Curated annotation (Swiss-Prot):
Cross-link (Glycyl lysine isopeptide (Lys-Gly) (interchain with G-Cter in SUMO2)): 129, 136, 236, 251, 336, 410, 432, 474, 485, 488, 531
Compositional bias ranges of the Basic and acidic residues kind: 412-421, 436-456, 499-510, 518-528
PROSITE patterns on file: ZF_CCHC
Organismal lineage: Eukaryota, Metazoa, Chordata, Craniata, Vertebrata
UniProt keyword terms in alphabetical order: Isopeptide bond, Metal-binding, Nucleus, Phosphoprotein, Repeat, Ubl conjugation, Zinc, Zinc-finger
UniProt source species: Rattus norvegicus (Rat)
Annotated SUPFAM superfamilies: Retrovirus zinc finger-like domains (SSF57756)
InterPro entries on file: TRAMP_AT-DNA-binding, Znf_CCHC, Znf_CCHC_sf
Location of this chain's protein in the cell: Nucleus, Nucleolus
Short name of one Pfam family: zf-CCHC
Stated name of the protein: Zinc finger CCHC domain-containing protein 7
Region (Disordered): 110-144, 396-542
Gene Ontology molecular functions: RNA binding; zinc ion binding
Compositional bias segments (type: Low complexity): 474-489
Annotated Basic residues bias: 422-435, 531-542
């Protein structure tokens, strides 16, 4: 009758592959399908009505209702009637606060709106009694035939009370598709996309954040920078370059930022492009206001040593590169065996394999400098080093002659202060050694020269007055004495007069004897005779 099975329970166990008895537990396959995909939903406004309705249905007996127009029906004792068609199988189990739906292929739910109190799977405590009745299907199935009717009855009152107590602990935030409740104050969650019950037809979504999240300053917005207090800790071994204190970086320093120094002269207040000590890229000299570069442009220079464009042989980088093995002063040390090129060759300009950066034909990333060869073509001897030093000295003389020698710039403020303190220390030590420090020889000579010059001026003042304003004829003794005085003063003249005499000697030989005779004659004559000599050529001219 039951296909080789003695009872209907054995037939159902073999049909649903359940080893345990159907009276003791729910079919495992059905339970797995129900709990595999669970969706929560709730109708808050009908929650109280469902509780009272469920209590009445729990006390009532099992009911099975089959409509003639339906194809397949499964009736649950504590729930509404569920319609199943041949193409779809749907089982709906609902709790007092939520509805659990399991979706499979060709599954549709058609629940009656009148009875919304469902039977409940109580989280692995479903039922103590399960009654199943199976009717044998007819050979020719019609739309009105019934395949299965499964009735689940919960008869224990203690389990109902336990399930009701469990449902009381369920809050609205645990369920999707619900509104914000005043009771949901015990959790910190950012609920997103919760819809209002009144705006179900609309597409508007109410976005809200819990008050506790706002108080705790928890947000999902990514900050623009790092936290301000991230590096302010005692255990951090970070030193600030702005205030020289440990525990934070310069970007998080509370003190104002220092002015950036220039990379050329290390002074603050200007940058590289406004530096007065900028150098010319062609001649490598400081670019002053009167600087005129007579060198060729860098793209017209070609080195005779490495055959690269941009410099001459005396400024080739191979000069300092050849000292890679030298550890003692003297000529560079040569390697015993020449080093071969490596097999893996990459370009620093285009990042391709097979060539070096100075051989690359692609566009340069940095156009202000020309590429140089990384290899060493020759090592210098003592003779080569001496010849290069001579050329450098000769070039330095030419620069000094043209006036293009770089002037000395002011020292930075830090070095001046250090020098000032150092001088003060020296003066203290010198005061202890000798109370009256000795002056240098140069300062002593300058002082003696100044004193002698003052004496000569005093001696010359009366002589000049007598010559300019003579007081009649004087005896020969007085004239001889006066003539001797200027001779002494001429021999003891200052250094300025000596230079002037040297300039006069460099003049033509014809002008020199006339001036000398005129000076010798004028030294012995009076002012009256001198004036007569000046008037004679005027009279002769007429």
């Amino acid at each position: 009758m039951f296909g080789g099975f003695e009872t209907i329970e054995a037939f159902e166990d073999d049909l649903y592959r359940d080893d345990s008895s159907s009276e003791l537990s729910v079919d495992s396959e059905v339970e797995f399908q129900l709990y595999s995909q669970v969706h929560y939903s709730q109708n808050i406004h009908n929650a109280n009505e469902e509780e009272g309705y469920e209590e009445k249905n729990c006390e009532s007996s099992e009911t099975v209702s089959i409509q003639p127009d339906q194809k397949n029906l499964i009736v649950l004792s504590d729930s509404e009637v569920i319609q199943l068609s041949d193409t779809s199988e749907v089982i709906t189990l609902s709790d007092e606060d939520s509805i659990y739906r399991c979706k499979r292929k060709n599954i549709e739910v058609q629940a009656q709106e009148k009875t919304q109190s469902p039977a409940t799977p109580r989280s692995n405590k479903v039922a103590n009694k399960c009654k199943r009745s199976n009717k044998k299907p007819e050979p020719e199935e019609s739309p009105s035939t019934i395949r299965e009717v499964m009735i689940i009855e919960v008869s224990s009152d203690e389990e109902e009370e336990s399930t009701i107590s469990e449902n009381e602990n369920v809050e609205s935030w645990m369920l999707l598709g619900c509104e914000e409740d005043d009771k949901d104050n015990d959790i910190l969650l950012n609920l997103v996309g919760c819809k209002d019950a009144g705006a179900e037809g609309e597409n508007d979504v109410n976005w809200f954040i819990s008050d506790k999240d706002i108080e705790a300053k928890i947000d999902n917005n990514r900050s623009s920078g790092r936290w301000n207090n991230r590096y302010y800790s005692v255990n951090k071994n970070v030193t600030c370059r702005n205030c020289d204190k440990r525990g934070h970086l310069s970007k998080n320093c509370p003190l104002p930022q220092k002015v950036r120094p220039c990379c050329l002269c290390s002074e603050r207040g200007h940058l590289q492009y406004g530096c007065p000590a900028r150098y010319c890229l062609d001649c490598s000299l400081p670019m002053s206001s009167t600087h005129r570069c007579f060198e060729r442009s860098s793209w017209r220079k070609r080195c005779d040593r490495c055959d690269m464009i941009g410099h001459y042989a005396d400024a080739c980088p191979e000069i300092w590169r050849q000292y890679h093995l030298t550890t003692k002063p003297g000529p560079p040390k040569k390697p015993k065996t020449p080093s071969g090129q490596s097999a893996l060759v990459y370009c620093y300009n285009c990042a391709q394999k097979g060539h070096y950066g100075h051989e690359c034909t692609e566009r340069r990333m940095f156009n202000q400098a020309f590429p140089t060869s990384p290899f060493i073509y020759c090592y210098d001897d003592k003779y080569d080093i001496q010849q290069r030093d001579r050329r450098i000295k000769r070039k330095l003389k030419d620069i000094k002659k043209n006036g293009d020698f770089p002037r000395q710039f002011k020292r930075p403020h830090g070095e001046e202060t250090d020098r000032y303190h150092h001088d003060r220390r020296k003066s203290r030590f010198s005061g202890k050694r000798s109370r009256w420090p000795r002056e240098s020889k140069e300062t002593q000579k300058e002082k003696t020269r100044g004193r002698e010059g003052e004496k000569h001026r005093r001696d010359r003042q009366p002589r000049d007055e007598d010559e300019d304003f003579p007081r009649g004829l004087k005896p020969n003794s007085s004239s001889s004495s006066n003539s001797q005085k200027p001779s002494k003063s001429l021999h003891q003249a200052s250094h300025y007069h000596r230079l002037r005499e040297e300039k006069l000697r460099r003049e033509s030989m014809r002008s020199k004897p006339k001036k000398r005779k005129f000076v010798e004659d004028g030294s012995h004559d009076d002012l009256f005779l001198i004036k007569q000599r000046k008037k004679k050529p005027k009279s002769s001219g007429f």
